[in-house]
Every structure is written in C-alpha cells, then in structure tokens.
Amino acid sequence: ICKTDLLSDLVGEFPELQGVLGGYFAEAQGFDKDICLAVSEHYLPIGTDSQIPKKPYSIALALSDKIDSLVGFFGINLKPTSSKDPYALRRLAIGMIKIILENRKTIKLRDLINYSLQLYNEQNLNFNLENTSTDLVVFLKDRFKNYMKEKNVRQDIIESSTSSYNIDDILKIYKKANTLNNMISKDIGLDVIFIYKRASNILIDEINKNNLEISDIADPGLFKNDFEKKLYKKIHDIRKE
C-alpha cells in the first residue's frame, strides 16, 4: 500500500506528493489511521528542517524503506561518489540517523542491513553479502560523523567515539560523544584530561624504563588500598551503563 500512489497520474505530475497521496489512498481503503500516517510519512525527513516520523508504525516503515533502498543500490554497486549522488543516498542515510537519534531508539543497524540482504537474496538477487554489508556500514558511519559535526561535536571526540564503539548502537555513541563534548569545555573536563595525560605519561615512562608489558585486565588481588577498589568498581559500573 505504501507505494501504490507512485502509479497515479497525480504523483507522476507532482512527485512531491508521493507518500502524502498514498496516505489518502490508504485511508480511502479503510486502513487504521496510524497505518495511513505511516504511509504518508515514510519518505520523511526530506530536508534539513523537515519533520521526522514519531509514531511506532511511522518510524518502522520509514526506516525499513530507507534501508531497503540503501541495500538495493549498494548491492548493485550504485554507490555515491565524492562528487555525485544521483539517487540521494546520503539524504536517506542522514534521514535514518535523524529518525533513530531524535526518537532515542536503540536499533542494531548491522542486523537491519543483513536482514534486508537476506530478503533480496530470497528473491534471487544474489548480492555479495559481506562486501555490501561492510560498504554500507562504512557509508553510514561516515554520515553519522557528519551528523555529529553539524551538531558541533569536536572532531577528535567524533573520531574517538566512532572508533571505540560498534556502529550498531549510534544512540549510545552519540550520547557519550555529546556528554564528553559538553564536559570538555568546562574546568572539570580540563582536569580530567590533565589527570589522564599524567597517568598515561607515567605508564609510558615505566614501560620504557623497565621493558614492561601492560595487560588490559586488572587483577583486584594486587590492590593495596580502598581507593583502587572503589575506582575499579566505578569503572565497571560505568561500563555496564
């Protein structure tokens, strides 16, 4: 139902009505009002200041349609280049990112991509699963970086946050990056950086002087005071969040 309006002469004459007209068609056929709204909104967002879908059916349909298009184009190797994006795939990717972040949804992007690839292959469109998935993840990651840059997140924070976490949970990455971005401009943020650099330099000096190997696994049995135990517990509590 969400694409039937593409066959109408009215949408052929006025392409900007696609989706909107589909919502009216769905309403005329007796579909639930939330379904009609989802059909009318599934192309959103269509611009920088465009509204985004907010209701569950609308979010689900908008994301499904966008990931289906992205997987399809990447599957047949019609990817955007640095100078050309004839199918507006960057806009689709940014649209997905905005829908997820502004609705505060935790969605595993890689699972969506792989499921869409599976559906294509079931229709005998045998895309290269690994290459298509990898290329699309990289593409979405780049769009996500651009989104954060437009939100005035520092470039070093963008790079560190996207390299430290899996792209599957962009909401988690964005929240952490935004928190760090806000904190780092304050006195407490500068203090944290100073402490981290000091500790890091001490470790590097000890490694170089004594030819040590540093493990990333702490041994609580070696702790000598309560400060170490409390710090260890706090780090683990934060990691669970």
Give, region by region, the residue ranges found by the protein language model:
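Amphipathic alpha-helical "coupling" segments that flank catalytic cores
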Residues: I1-E241
